[in-house]
């Protein structure tokens, strides 16, 4: 086992604080509308330019192992805030740095670290409750656009684009961000349910100019099995041909004789048919087939529940107003399923989302809800160069997370004002002893740090602005973009409550642990291997 290097008490804490400061100083230059960029060197390709706090934090590794431990713990604050709310990473880092710096001063002055931590925790718990009372719901398109604009570093076009996307697909809809091909940002909205499976044979194409299959008012056959024998299909095909409507087959697979016969029938114009594979794999495929059945008012023909394909009738088939299939995707528009059945299915999936343990499962379930209840919007980010594209895409993703958080828990005044108002409301809070009171003061002082940093990045004097804002009340604050005072909500400077809350909670959590650190252990650096000299040969 490698030898260890151990540091105790103040020696350990000083090293740790140095690491915290290196990381936090690099991150906090990006805060606010006049925050600066950070350039990150990459081992290959062009450097990345970013104003995203967590992207900067993730790049930082320090040579000194004790300092690096401090930096990595603050990196955890940024990552956790990013995972919880998708934004607020820089605010969380600034808060953590302030709590750690002030807290360690108090420890050096002889305060009890555990009582300091209890005081900090008490102040943060009270602050979170106050934030909830300050929060106002964010429901209209204008407020959503303002939140998106602030989070995308004051880029109004991004805010408007996200508001438009949310307007079109609803609060439950899925919005994804992709690289665009032009210079302008574009919004692409997919109506109905779309899944990533294209036609099984190009001979099904009936719109050669677009290379797509379009079926008007088709019947939809859903089968949880491979279809290779055409005899199983004959009763359904005959019934559909009599009804004079097209047929879409969604099955695990359609192959061999069955596929060949369907192609021949389509080409001769006997019956208009298209076949696609069912989306997903394993249990997820079964669930998605059931979603499509609910949406189209059909039944999944599954041998697991004793149903046979030969015995299926038109009553078992789903229907939709229109289906469009290209080589990669199938879109079902306006299924005829009952609204109550669709809502029941959505409620059931939401329940599964609450019980899901992994982020991947949760994301996939959320997509299924969107396909049933809302729709899917794709924001295509346009830029002149690849470097700009990466930077802009990261900002759009941040803004998207922020608007989702705003819809979820509401918004508070931005620009660090909400935390200042919260701090003034809980200023009279008292702990059980004097050391806890110092902990409370440390937390209250830290709540001013985001506003101070925003002002500092503007080139103004933080203390003057902070005192002016404190002398006002309600949403009165400082608009750093225009350098004027006023009502932050009226000026459209909003922060999602969830982002502010998460930043404060995670910063206090990690900072509290660091203040109570008494010993640090790391591996000793390995020395160079001893030189063994040249091996002696056999004399000849």
UniProtKB/Swiss-Prot annotation:
<dbReference type="GO" id="GO:0005737">
    <property type="term" value="C:cytoplasm"/>
</dbReference>
<feature type="binding site">
    <location>
        <position position="415"/>
    </location>
    <ligand>
        <name>ATP</name>
    </ligand>
</feature>
<keyword id="KW-0963">Cytoplasm</keyword>
<keyword id="KW-0143">Chaperone</keyword>
<dbReference type="GO" id="GO:0016853">
    <property type="term" value="F:isomerase activity"/>
</dbReference>
<dbReference type="GO" id="GO:0140662">
    <property type="term" value="F:ATP-dependent protein folding chaperone"/>
</dbReference>
<feature type="binding site">
    <location>
        <position position="495"/>
    </location>
    <ligand>
        <name>ATP</name>
    </ligand>
</feature>
<dbReference type="GO" id="GO:0042026">
    <property type="term" value="P:protein refolding"/>
</dbReference>
<comment type="subunit">
    <text>Forms a cylinder of 14 subunits composed of two heptameric rings stacked back-to-back. Interacts with the co-chaperonin GroES.</text>
</comment>
<feature type="binding site">
    <location>
        <position position="51"/>
    </location>
    <ligand>
        <name>ATP</name>
    </ligand>
</feature>
<keyword id="KW-0547">Nucleotide-binding</keyword>
<dbReference type="Pfam" id="PF00118">
    <property type="entry name" value="Cpn60_TCP1"/>
</dbReference>
<dbReference type="InterPro" id="IPR002423">
    <property type="entry name" value="Cpn60/GroEL/TCP-1"/>
</dbReference>
<feature type="binding site">
    <location>
        <begin position="30"/>
        <end position="33"/>
    </location>
    <ligand>
        <name>ATP</name>
    </ligand>
</feature>
<dbReference type="GO" id="GO:0005524">
    <property type="term" value="F:ATP binding"/>
</dbReference>
<feature type="binding site">
    <location>
        <begin position="87"/>
        <end position="91"/>
    </location>
    <ligand>
        <name>ATP</name>
    </ligand>
</feature>
<protein>
    <recommendedName>
        <fullName>Chaperonin GroEL</fullName>
        <ecNumber>5.6.1.7</ecNumber>
    </recommendedName>
</protein>
<keyword id="KW-0413">Isomerase</keyword>
<comment type="similarity">
    <text>Belongs to the chaperonin (HSP60) family.</text>
</comment>
<dbReference type="InterPro" id="IPR027413">
    <property type="entry name" value="GROEL-like_equatorial_sf"/>
</dbReference>
<keyword id="KW-0067">ATP-binding</keyword>
<dbReference type="InterPro" id="IPR027409">
    <property type="entry name" value="GroEL-like_apical_dom_sf"/>
</dbReference>
<dbReference type="InterPro" id="IPR027410">
    <property type="entry name" value="TCP-1-like_intermed_sf"/>
</dbReference>
<feature type="binding site">
    <location>
        <begin position="479"/>
        <end position="481"/>
    </location>
    <ligand>
        <name>ATP</name>
    </ligand>
</feature>
<comment type="function">
    <text>Together with its co-chaperonin GroES, plays an essential role in assisting protein folding. The GroEL-GroES system forms a nano-cage that allows encapsulation of the non-native substrate proteins and provides a physical environment optimized to promote and accelerate protein folding.</text>
</comment>
<dbReference type="InterPro" id="IPR001844">
    <property type="entry name" value="Cpn60/GroEL"/>
</dbReference>
<dbReference type="InterPro" id="IPR018370">
    <property type="entry name" value="Chaperonin_Cpn60_CS"/>
</dbReference>
């Amino acid at each position: 086992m490698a030898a260890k290097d151990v540091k105790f008490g103040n020696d350990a804490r000083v090293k740790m604080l140095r690491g915290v400061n290196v990381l936090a100083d690099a991150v906090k230059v990006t805060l606010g509308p006049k925050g600066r960029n950070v350039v990150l060197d990459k081992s290959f390709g062009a450097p990345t330019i970013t104003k995203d706090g967590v992207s900067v934090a993730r790049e930082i590794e320090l040579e000194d192992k004790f300092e690096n431990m401090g930096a990595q713990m603050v990196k955890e604050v940024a990552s956790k805030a990013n995972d919880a709310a998708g934004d607020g990473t820089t605010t969380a880092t600034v808060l953590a740095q302030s709590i750690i710096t002030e807290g360690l001063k108090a420890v050096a002055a002889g305060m009890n670290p555990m009582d300091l931590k209890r005081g900090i925790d008490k102040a943060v718990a009270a602050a979170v409750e106050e934030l909830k009372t300050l929060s106002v719901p964010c429901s209209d398109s204008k407020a959503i656009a303002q939140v998106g604009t602030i989070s995308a570093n004051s880029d109004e076009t991004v805010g408007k684009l996200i508001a438009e996307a949310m307007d079109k697909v609803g609060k439950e809809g899925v919005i994804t961000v992709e690289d665009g091909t032009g210079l302008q940002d574009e919004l692409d909205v997919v109506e109905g349910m779309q899944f990533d499976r294209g036609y099984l044979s190009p001979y099904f194409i009936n719109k050669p100019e677009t290379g797509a299959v379009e079926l008007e008012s088709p019947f939809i056959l859903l089968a949880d099995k491979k279809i290779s024998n055409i005899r199983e299909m004959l009763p359904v095909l005959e019934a559909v041909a009599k009804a004079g409507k097209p047929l879409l087959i969604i099955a695990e697979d359609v192959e061999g004789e069955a596929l060949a016969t369907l192609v021949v029938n389509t080409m001769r114009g006997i019956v208009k048919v298209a076949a696609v594979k069912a989306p997903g794999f394993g249990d997820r495929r079964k669930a998605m087939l059931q979603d499509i059945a609910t949406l189209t008012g059909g039944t999944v023909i599954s041998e697991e529940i004793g149903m046979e394909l030969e015995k299926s009738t038109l009553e078992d088939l789903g229907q939709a107003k229109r289906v469009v299939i290209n080589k990669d995707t199938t879109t079902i528009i306006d299924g005829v399923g009952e609204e109550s059945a669709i809502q029941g299915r959505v409620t059931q999936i939401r329940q599964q989302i609450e019980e899901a343990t992994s982020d991947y499962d949760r994301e996939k379930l959320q997509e299924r809800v969107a396909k049933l209840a809302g729709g899917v919007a794709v924001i295509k980010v346009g830029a002149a160069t690849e470097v700009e594209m990466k930077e802009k895409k990261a900002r759009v993703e941040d803004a998207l997370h922020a608007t989702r958080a705003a819809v979820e828990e509401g918004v508070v005044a931005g620009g660090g004002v909400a935390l200042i108002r919260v701090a003034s409301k809980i200023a009279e809070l008292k702990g059980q002893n004097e050391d806890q009171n110092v902990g409370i003061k440390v937390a209250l002082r830290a709540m001013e740090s985001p506003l101070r940093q925003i002002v500092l990045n503007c080139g103004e004097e933080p203390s003057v602005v902070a005192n002016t804002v404190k002398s006002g009340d309600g949403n009165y604050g400082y608009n750093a973009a225009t350098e004027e005072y006023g009502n932050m909500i009226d000026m459209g400077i909003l922060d999602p409550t969830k982002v502010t809350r998460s930043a404060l909670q995670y910063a206090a959590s990690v900072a509290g642990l660091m203040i109570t650190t008494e010993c640090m252990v790391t591996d000793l650096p390995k020395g160079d291997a001893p030189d063994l000299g040249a091996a002696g040969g056999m004399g000849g």
